[in-house]
Amino acid sequence: MFLALDIGNTNITVGLFAMKDKKVLPEPLKVWIMSTVKERTFDEYATLLMNMLFYDGFDAKQLSNFAVASVVPSLNAVFEELIKKYFGEKTFFVNSKNCGGLVFAAGNSKETGADRIANVVAAYSVYGDSCIVIDFGTATTFDCINSEGIYIGGAIAPGPSISARLLNLKTEQLPRVEVKKPLKSIGLTTVECMQSGLYFGYTGLVKELIARIKNEMKIKHIIATGGLAGLMFDEIEEIEIILPYLTLSGVRIVWEKVI
């Protein structure tokens, strides 16, 4: 079996894939999510992983291939050691060199996050045409690939959860609130006002960036992924579809192309 890991700043998404004739099947058998905690040791992460496998009826001994897209460099060695110690295997890391042949138009490709690489590789694999991939995570990333499969670049904005947290941390009177769609834009309470600003202000940000990107290049498809994609989907009509496991799929595809 094949294990793909998307190590983000808030969560680590783990996808288990079956293999047949040395090829990874496209749909994950199971997906788990664990919190990203930089202080955890590889033994602690291994315990979590083994427990998830065990309780869902999977045999850890059947795992033989591992690939990681990480935007938390401090955890790379942790998972590399985990996989080496508990499974006796090497870890494949998605990066600008291990990118499955993705061509970068310009700029410093070394700075492009592994999750962003995985996202555009997966999107182009699905559509074979120009796309914007919007990943609603800790940060919200916009990544553009053209009809020739060349990665053009994109934009990065703070995610709504970060904005909500900072409003609470950097002020004395504003509470910490859940990011949710309010019933109307004019709030009556402080919480309602904050939720209006966070939700409608944020969806406005996304719509504006989509419009500006479309003014600069031809776009056929707009895809969303990430933890808050479902919350934003109804308000942003430009988004065509949500693909919740896009990053894991990209990790799988890159691994197959390189290995």
Swiss-Prot record:
Binding of K(+): at which residues? Answer: D135
Q: How is the cofactor bound?
A: A monovalent cation. Ammonium or potassium.
A single GO BP term for this record reads: coenzyme A biosynthetic process
Known InterPro entries for this protein?
ATPase_NBD (IPR043129), Type_III_PanK (IPR004619)
GO molecular function of the protein, one example?
ATP binding
Residues annotated as the enzyme's active site = D115 (proton acceptor)
Protein's UniProt keywords contain Chaperone: no
Please give the catalytic activity noted in the UniProt record.
(R)-pantothenate + ATP = (R)-4'-phosphopantothenate + ADP + H(+)
- This protein's major location comes to cytoplasm
Query: Quick one: which residues bind ATP?
Result: D6, I7, G8, N9, T10, N11, I12, T13, T138
- EC number, as in UniProt: 2.7.1.33
- Localization, UniProt: Cytoplasm
Under the heading Gene3D superfamilies, the entry gives: 3.30.420.40
Q: Give the species this sequence originates from.
A: Endomicrobium trichonymphae
Q: How does it assemble?
A: Homodimer.
Q: What does this protein do?
A: Catalyzes the phosphorylation of pantothenate (Pan), the first step in CoA biosynthesis.
Pathway where it operates: Cofactor biosynthesis; coenzyme A biosynthesis; CoA from (R)-pantothenate: step 1/5
Q: Does the keyword Cytoplasm apply?
A: yes
Q: Which domain of life is it from?
A: Bacteria
What protein is this chain from? Type III pantothenate kinase
HAMAP family recorded for this chain? Pantothen_kinase_3
The enzyme's main class, written as a single word, is transferase
The residues the record assigns to binding substrate are G113, A114, D115, R116, T190
Q: Which UniProt keywords apply?
A: ATP-binding, Coenzyme A biosynthesis, Cytoplasm, Kinase, Metal-binding, Nucleotide-binding, Potassium, Transferase
Concerning its family, UniProt says:
Belongs to the type III pantothenate kinase family.
Q: Which cofactor does it need?
A: NH4(+); K(+)
Q: Which GO terms describe its cellular component?
A: cytoplasm
